Amino acid sequence: MVSSLLPNPPSAECWAALLHDPMTLDMDAVLSDFVRSTGAEPGLARDLLEGKNWDLTAALSDYEQLRQVHTANLPHVFNEGRCAKQAERELPQPGHKVERPCLQRQDDIAQAEKRLSRGISHASSAIVSLARSHVANECNNEQFPLEMPIYTFQLPDLSVYSEDFRSFIERDLIEQATMVALEQAGRLNWWSTVCTSCKRLLPLATTGDGNCLLHAASLGMWGFHDRDLVLRKALYTMMRTGAEREALKRRWRWQQTQQNKEEEWEREWTELLKLASSEPRTHFSKNGSGTGGGVDNSEDPVYESLEEFHVFVLAHILRRPIVVVADTMLRDSGGEAFAPIPFGGIYLPLEVPPNRCHCSPLVLAYDQAHFSALVSMEQRDQQREQAVIPLTDSEHKLLPLHFAVDPGKDWEWGKDDNDNARLANLILSLEAKLNLLHSYMNVTWIRIPSETRAPLAQPESPTASAGEDVQSLAESLDSDRDSVCSNSNSNNGKNGKDKEKEKQRKDKDKTRADSVANKLGSFSKTLGIKLKKNMGGLGGLVHGKMGRANSANGKNGDSAERNKEKKSKSRKGSKEESGASASTSPSEKTTPSPTDKASGASPADKGSGSRGDAWKYSTDVKLSLNILRAAMQGERKFIFAGLLLTSHRHQFHEEMIGYYLTSAQERFSAEQEQRRRDAAAAAAAATATATVKRPARRPEAEGAPGPERASPGPTAAQPTQLVLKLKERPSPGTGASARAARAAGGAASPGPGGGARRAAPGTGGPTPGRSPPAPARQSVIHVQAAARDEACAPTVGALRPCATYPQQNRSLWSQSYSPARSALRTVNTVESLAPGGADAPGPAEHKSQTYSNGFGAARDGLEFADADAPAARSNAECGRGGPGPAQRRCQRENCAFYGRAETEHFCSYCYREELRRRREARAARP
């Protein structure tokens, strides 16, 4: 294929030029080309192509813009898509790391294999296979809805490990890009920021083969992927032949738009059913031949992407609520929202009685057309923090409750859709939604600490406040109740006129309040909220006004009396809230009343029957309603959340975690060792490069005074180049980093003699507390020996003195001295003294080596341990004024330095060693 010939596509335009065929292509082929070229989720690819009328070039351009805007805050990807991954395998790059940007899953086929081979699922294939078999046997005992044990997976406590190992595990298991994107959008872990008693939830890395929804659900419960397609097959079976099939279909059709024709509904339902199949996706090539198993036969099978209705069906299979954390809009390169994301919200198993369901929800994350499991982390003190999932967003607005309405078996599509009375009976009020949440979950109100509690929510402008949302909500709720409680068939026209007048009156009141608030300066926002609260808000006179209007329109006295009661109760909402909060601990949970849970009535029947009396719910529901209304008005003192039960685990949980940690430790050690080898190789390469360039600069160094010649090494210009090369690399070890940090700070470093090294520029003689000359000269010897040994066997330890040596030489050339450099030079030099011989001066000799302004002062303050050194010094003084004589490579074998005729073509160090050897030979003669 054309895509396999491109190792690294630079942009979407290049892909468009190569993949776009001017001929009319089958939609499946176009979709396949788009997915193959970008690695995007098929669901996102289909949306982009449909938005551009299946124009591949335009869709690829939009995708490129989306990728660019979302990679601003995330690491950049150098190779995108499945084709780039194939080319990457052919041309491996050492140290190359690929991370997923915001709009491209890191879980294309190649990356999925990499992830799955390192995750908990593959820590021990025997243990995981045994666990899968056990789960499959449990699932086969039930017919269609799998009787799932209430398992909730938790990550092990990673705080007990070192920071490096913890970071390694987090990169291995956690979907970093998803976590960053959702946290920045304010959708994930905002509750742990405002309330420290709440645990953070972390998205687990999930493979992206089209089955990510069920993989994520399996990971969230058991810790392994749904490789055996147990959940996928159960999903398909329930949608095809399950007892709840018709009711689920009605709920799905009700939530969809009413724009489809009758024959289109069946076709849409058939397509939806086909998506749930466990059969891999089939792609048709341009010549009409079909290929199964993804893009080509060599890859793993790719399944059809699932939609939000499949999440709702999955909740019935698991018999437990599902909460999906997702952003609400997909945005283009300019930040403008161009497509909604409908997945976020709450999915309840409404076709199963609450007393037969698990109350602990399964929590999933959805980002970039990809699902991930959201799990918490174990802690030593489990009582200190609790695992919860808020049922509101960060603005304390209730999350969407998906597919909550079932019109019933007797609903006639196309006829009853125009009956306003029947439509009004199907509208769920806020109280009804809260009652469903209390029935299916263990909900709790978590108190927000006063120190992290946000001040009273202020409107962004005097004309756009939270009160408007509350007021519109109150209007819709009251209108729904009025439609239910009144005889709307007889008073339809009259009620419509009265409601229109009432709405105009409220708009006038709100406008008056805003105009007053605008004139009051800094006090306008708070006063504006209070005026709206009294004139048109949820906690003010709105219920009283509606009650009086209903009474004037001929409504019965019971309705007016009920509205008055609602008015008084809403006015007392803050008092009830404060009273309840004083007696409620942060961990205390409010549960539905026993009568609600004991009743086995269908939720649909319960919902329709409850609308006749909006206040028949339990006290917990009314308390939740009052607190939620107060939160929407700005008094945000609590978080409305569902409790996550993490105490139930399957019997193979501990074994899986143990095997994974053992495997991760081995891989971590291997990775660290590989990094050390790479660092040593890079250091050797840098040293070799510097050595090759050294001869061109050597005459300048040889023309310097004797003290400089006593330190064989590169010149002042060349060491700077070497230092820059070494600084571009990371430190090879923590010890070197610590020493470099101490050196940079000017700290004194203990030398071989045990004393702290300190020096001041400008001193010319011996000074008490000054470092002895031996350690300084030893560091020079150590550097040369290390440089000589690196050619044979480069080691990590050889990098450290080599990196400090040019700094010493540079300090001599610039006629300045730094105590930090002195401290850095003298580290780890004792072990290099052994080859120096017994005559080398020890640390106890009180000889000073001082660096000061001027070469003469520095020369006068230096002494040498051997007798022949002054001769070399005088020779250096003779050649000081002009360029040095011709030089050649040192005569000693394997020595990388250069010598001159005065030193018999030995370098200065080898020359001293040769003189010492001769003296010893003469002394040994009889």
From Swiss-Prot:
InterPro entries linked to this entry: OTU_Deubiquitinase, OTU_dom, UBA_8, Znf_A20
Region (Catalytic): 185-452
EC number(s) stated in the UniProt entry for this protein: 3.4.19.12
GO molecular function, one term: DNA binding
Enzymatic reactions: Thiol-dependent hydrolysis of ester, thioester, amide, peptide and isopeptide bonds formed by the C-terminal Gly of ubiquitin (a 76-residue protein attached to proteins as an intracellular targeting signal)
Domain of life: Eukaryota
GO cellular component, one term: nucleus
Protein name per the record: OTU domain-containing protein 7A
Naturally occurring in which organism (per UniProt): Mus musculus
High-level lineage: Eukaryota, Metazoa, Chordata, Craniata, Vertebrata
Gene: Otud7a
